[in-house]
Amino acid sequence: MKQIIVNLKTKKYDIVISQSENDFFTALAKAAKTNMFFVITDKNVEKLHLKYFTVLLKRKGFNVKTAVISAGEIGKNIKSLSFLYDKALEAGIDRKSCAIALGGGVIGDVAGFFAATYMRGINYIQVPTTLLAMTDSSVGGKTAVNIKGGKNIAGVFYQPDLVWINSAFLSTLTERHIKNGLAEIIKYAFTFDKKFYSYLSDTLENGTVPPKDFEYIIYQSCSYKARVVEKDEKEITGLRAVLNFGHTFAHALETATKYKKFLHGEAVAVGMLFAVKLSLKLRICKPETYKEVENLLQKADFTLSTKNNARQMLSLMKKDKKSIDGNIKFILIKDIGKAVSTYVKDNVVLNVLKNFTGENK
């Protein structure tokens, strides 16, 4: 078992990385003082893991209610929230109950938002089942849903009471979904740690890492994120914004393609390359740094090009949460392991966008 304690000003909670059910129940006894659990999942995870997980809880004598929403970004909306509120009320979920997010990043976001707002807030636990959720979205308390105009526009910061990461869940993922999680892992290397970059560069094989290394990269990724969240829980100082490297472009790309073409990590991979092109244009980084970023993303076998309209992408990026008064803030990198945040003028962004999307060819 590996354990990380996230120590915030208002609370602290454990990230438990273990395949042991006993380790989970030991942590659960400390985190949730209730007999009633409301397990929220999606239609894909329902088929794979819901029965196992509910039986696991019921064997310990817990009262378990469940709710299932649509899988993927199409289920990450206010309609799903409304469904969960009604379902919880019908099931007798009260303020002392505990919600459990069983699934990937979308489920973590929706279930967290539900927990933050149902009866003005109930406890919740993250049980991520994807590599992306295990290494990024389950930690840190960001919860949100999408609206028509953009991704993650409606949301709150609401910390979980426990994160249980069981890497055995990864055995049911496709290669594409493993790679989807690798993008966020690579992000930590680009923004925080050159040694981790070297490790990934040496370890990546055929677009993935050996399963024996999963727990190590999960632990490393969660450690990076936990330390940042402790220092800047709600993105007040700007330190936590570094975790959004590649995301300004990625969220615009996902919105432009109506969440149908790219998984989140795939969009982030393209977004990271765009951010480094922007860094190069502004002379924030050297050509060698750009090449290092490109090489690792290629080793992970990501598609790194897109043909979306440059002006549409610019318009969508101006709606990003980091933008102020229409000025787009980007996370850029000076070198591997060194990130900076800065506002970039529209004409510069548009010029790089046109080159990046092939409009200038």
From Swiss-Prot:
Give the catalytic activity. Answer: 7-phospho-2-dehydro-3-deoxy-D-arabino-heptonate = 3-dehydroquinate + phosphate
Q: What class of enzyme is it?
A: lyase
Q: Which residues form the signal peptide?
A: none
- Cell location: Cytoplasm
Pathway annotation from the record = Metabolic intermediate biosynthesis; chorismate biosynthesis; chorismate from D-erythrose 4-phosphate and phosphoenolpyruvate: step 2/7
Q: Which Gene3D superfamilies match?
A: 3.40.50.1970, Dehydroquinate synthase-like - alpha domain (1.20.1090.10)
Give binding positions for NAD(+): 105-109, 129-130, 142, 151, 169-172
> Biological process (GO) annotations?
amino acid biosynthetic process; aromatic amino acid family biosynthetic process; chorismate biosynthetic process
Q: Which UniProt keywords apply?
A: Amino-acid biosynthesis, Aromatic amino acid biosynthesis, Cobalt, Cytoplasm, Lyase, Metal-binding, NAD, Nucleotide-binding, Zinc
- Cofactor annotation: Co(2+); Zn(2+); NAD(+)
Q: Report residues binding Zn(2+).
A: 184, 247, 264
- UniProt cofactor note: Binds 1 divalent metal cation per subunit. Can use either Co(2+) or Zn(2+).
Enzyme nomenclature, EC number: 4.2.3.4
**Chief location of this protein?**
cytoplasm
Q: Which InterPro entries match?
A: Dehydroquinate_synthase, DHQ_synth_AroB, DHQ_synth_fam, DHQS/DOIS_N, DHQS_C
Q: Its GO CC terms?
A: cytoplasm
Provide the GO MF annotations for this entry: 3-dehydroquinate synthase activity; metal ion binding; nucleotide binding
Pfam families according to UniProt: DHQ_synthase (PF01761), DHQS_C (PF24621)
**Family per UniProt?**
Belongs to the sugar phosphate cyclases superfamily. Dehydroquinate synthase family.
**NCBIfam families, alphabetically?**
aroB
Describe the function of this protein.
Catalyzes the conversion of 3-deoxy-D-arabino-heptulosonate 7-phosphate (DAHP) to dehydroquinate (DHQ).
Name of the molecule in the record = 3-dehydroquinate synthase
